[in-house]
């Protein structure tokens, strides 16, 4: 298969995360495209756009595509008009949404937004969430577990850690605690009151498969308990009963991606 090459110019008046995310989602549908991404962040004036256009002109014999999330109408029009002159495909992905909301609610959009401060606050909130989550992985530092936004509880190998880190990147402080069969739960349940605590479960056969693979990867196939079908089934049953006793929502992660599981957790969080 011959790969087609595309220079993708992602233009934003903020950090560029939105336009990058949208572009990645779109490009997943084109495995035959080799993409070079040019991210132009914090674009606030025509001079910056002129530099972008100069870069595009230097590659005029190649395939170029512009996607932007500039919210300033005048600046966005300046970019669009010049892309038309250069015969470069151009798409704005926020302006239509903003316009539709404005029209539907019959209100004008806010013109003066301190986006720089907002972005800085989001950045530091995310860093704080990531640090908290790393320090509260696998039952560590439970003395201040009540500072978590979300607590995940589940038996070993139920994707608690990767799910926690994904949520942390979204700005949530997450603690995850292992549930170990026949051992008393060592977290003070009083600290979990009024906190979103999720019980994580999985299909028995799938967990056995995951645990066997784990034992193989660490050359410990001789462990007859960790992946024993009867023990695993009892462990999951005991965990689920414990979750129900505490009225915690239960999420089955069998054959579900980290993104899907996280989206469900965020839905629960938004209902609090």
UniProtKB/Swiss-Prot annotation:
Residues noted as binding ADP in the record, renumbered to the chain: 154-161
Pfam families: Kinase-PPPase
Record-listed E.C. numbers: 2.7.11.32, 2.7.4.27
Reactions catalysed according to its record: N(tele)-phospho-L-histidyl/L-threonyl-[pyruvate, phosphate dikinase] + ADP = N(tele)-phospho-L-histidyl/O-phospho-L-threonyl-[pyruvate, phosphate dikinase] + AMP + H(+); N(tele)-phospho-L-histidyl/O-phospho-L-threonyl-[pyruvate, phosphate dikinase] + phosphate + H(+) = N(tele)-phospho-L-histidyl/L-threonyl-[pyruvate, phosphate dikinase] + diphosphate
SS bond partners: none
Molecular function as annotated in GO: ADP binding; ATP binding; phosphotransferase activity, phosphate group as acceptor; protein serine/threonine kinase activity
PANTHER family listed in its UniProt record: PYRUVATE, PHOSPHATE DIKINASE REGULATORY PROTEIN 1, CHLOROPLASTIC
UniProt record similarity statement: Belongs to the pyruvate, phosphate/water dikinase regulatory protein family. PDRP subfamily.
Name of this protein: Putative pyruvate, phosphate dikinase regulatory protein
């Amino acid at each position: 298969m011959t790969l087609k090459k595309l220079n993708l110019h992602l233009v934003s008046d903020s950090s560029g995360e939105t336009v990058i995310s949208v572009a990645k989602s779109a490009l997943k549908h084109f495995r035959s495209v080799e993409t070079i991404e040019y991210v132009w962040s914090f674009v606030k004036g025509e001079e910056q756009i002129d530099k972008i256009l100069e870069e595009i002109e230097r590659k005029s014999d190649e395939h170029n595509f512009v996607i932007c999330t500039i919210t300033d109408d005048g600046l966005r029009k300046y970019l669009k008009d010049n892309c038309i002159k250069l015969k470069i495909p151009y798409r704005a992905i926020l302006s239509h949404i903003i316009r539709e909301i404005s029209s539907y609610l019959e209100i004008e959009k806010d013109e003066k937004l301190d986006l720089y401060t907002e972005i800085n606050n989001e950045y530091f909130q995310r860093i704080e969430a990531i640090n908290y989550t790393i320090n509260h992985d696998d039952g560590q530092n439970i003395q201040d577990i009540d500072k978590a936004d979300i607590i995940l509880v589940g038996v070993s190998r139920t994707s608690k850690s990767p799910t926690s880190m994904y949520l942390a990147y979204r700005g949530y402080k997450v603690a995850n605690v292992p549930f170990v069969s026949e051992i008393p739960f060592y977290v003070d349940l009083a600290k979990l009151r009024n906190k979103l605590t999720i019980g994580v479960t999985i299909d028995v056969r799938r967990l056995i498969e995951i645990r066997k693979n784990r034992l193989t990867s660490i050359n410990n196939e001789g462990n007859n308990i960790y992946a024993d079908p009867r023990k695993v089934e009892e462990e999951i049953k005991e965990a689920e009963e414990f979750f129900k006793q505490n009225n915690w929502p239960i999420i089955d992660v069998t054959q579900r991606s980290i993104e899907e599981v996280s989206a469900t957790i965020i839905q629960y969080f938004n209902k609090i």
